[in-house]
Amino acid sequence: MQGLHHFVPTDLKAAYINQLLKVGFDTLDFGSFVSPKAIPQMRDTSEVLAKLDLSGTATKLLAIVANERGAQEACQYPEIQYLGYPFSISETFQLRNTNATIAESIERTKAIQDLCTAHGKEL
């Protein structure tokens, strides 16, 4: 969804994810807490989360984060069980995707792991 040029309305995203929640997946990557300048499509992740019906599902939610700021935001939501960090074996892709080298990303994930531990989340 992040590659789409037109903004997908929040209600449509939530309706789609609510349908996926009915399937019974173990884990669902539902959104990202990243800079809206970097990925405008994900600017409404908090609003999408608020519209999800988690009452009849055992599916766990995973949010992608690319830095500590995103991890801090994601950790504020008890509905989110997992945080994901976009790692690549390609230095070029890692830089383009996270604005950090692989070595810097390793350090970032250490800080993100500390946040996860403090908030009962998994990375």
Could you say what each language-model-derived stretch is?
Residues L20, A74, L83:
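Conserved, mostly hydrophobic/aromatic
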Residues D26-L52, Y85-T101:
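Glycine-rich, proline-tolerant flexible connector loops at the mouths of alpha/beta enzymes
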Residues G3, D26-F30, T59-V65, Q81-Y85, ...:
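Hydrophobic faces of well-ordered beta-strands that scaffold small-molecule active sites
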Residues M1-A14, T59-E68, Q94-I102:
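Active-site mouth loops of central-metabolism enzymes
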Residues A66-P78:
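Catalytic cores of alpha/beta
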Residues M1-F30, Q41-E47, L54-A58:
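Conserved N-terminal beta1-alpha1 strand-loop-helix module at the mouth
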Residues A38-A63, E104-L123:
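Alpha-helix-loop-beta-strand connector modules within alpha/beta enzyme cores
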Residues M1-H5, G84-N97, G120-L123:
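N-terminal small/glycine-rich loop or linker at the start of catalytic domains
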